[in-house]
Swiss-Prot record:
This is UPF0301 protein Nwi_2752. One of its GO terms (cellular component) is cytosol. Transmembrane segments: none annotated. InterPro entries: AlgH-like (IPR003774). It holds the Pfam family DUF179. Belongs to the UPF0301 (AlgH) family. It comes from Nitrobacter winogradskyi (strain ATCC 25391 / DSM 10237 / CIP 104748 / NCIMB 11846 / Nb-255). PANTHER family: UNCHARACTERIZED PROTEIN YQGE, UPF0301 PROTEIN YQGE. Gene3D superfamilies: VC0467-like.
Length: 221
């Protein structure tokens, strides 16, 4: 994870290398999907996104950016990352608060996989660094939030994602029209819930869809 002290959205690229600053997106435009969940349809051919549930952090005419919620980062452990980043000494790991000990690390997407993004509840905010996304949900991409979590002074709910999913202008809209994604409102239980394996099924049930009956239907709910 690359150390960063600046706010989210600076020095980012779409998957196709086009520039996008999420801090400049039209967050409150009703035509966009900020704060919504994307649920991959069976026709999704890209294995990186098969059966994925993605929280859309930013969406505008300039493109979209989101965090995959149900792809654990394998052997990557949050406490080990704190040690690697010199936020805490290994000998002090025993002193970590429960919120840090249980912090989930996700594969947030295929773009900038060496950079960390913390999706969290809105009870924590850093001026000029935290991006409010939707009611109760924010995104912060600086080391300051990791330091706060390690001290027990961070947000009540949070997940750390390595990398993100990015779409060029109009790309996400096209994928939805091609039945690649369903989208629906998000809730904190789905975003921060610890039952990672069941998030895909739970997201579908949230909008009344039986996964066994899912086919190439319309891409919204």
């Amino acid at each position: 994870m690359k150390p960063a002290r600046k706010g989210p959205g600076r020095d980012r690229r779409h998957a196709d290398d086009a520039d996008m600053d999420i801090a400049d997106t039209d967050t409150y435009d009703r035509n966009y999907l900020d704060g919504q969940l994307l649920i991959a349809m069976p026709v999704m051919e890209d294995e990186r996104f098969a059966r994925s549930v993605i929280y859309v952090c930013a969406h505008s005419s300039e493109g979209a950016m989101g965090i995959i919620l149900n792809r654990p980062a394998g052997s990557v452990d949050f406490s080990d990352l704190l040690v690697q980043l010199d936020i805490i000494k290994r000998a002090d790991l025993i002193k970590l608060p429960e919120t840090a000990e249980t912090m989930k690390v996700m594969k947030g997407g295929p773009v900038e996989t060496g950079r960390g993004f913390v999706l969290h509840s809105s009870d924590f905010f850093i001026e000029d660094a935290t991006l409010p996304i939707d009611e109760g949900i924010c995104l912060t991409a600086t080391l300051d939030i990791l330091e706060a979590i390690a001290k027990g002074a961070g947000p009540k709910h949070a997940i750390l994602a390595l990398g993100y999913a990015g779409w060029a202008p109009g790309q996400l809209e096209t994928e939805i029209q091609d039945n690649g994604w369903l989208h629906c409102p998000a809730d904190q239980d789905l975003i921060f819930g610890r039952d990672i394996e069941d998030k895909y099924v739970r997201a579908l049930h949230k909008i009344g869809i039986d996964p066994g009956m899912l086919s190439n239907e319309a891409g919204h709910a």
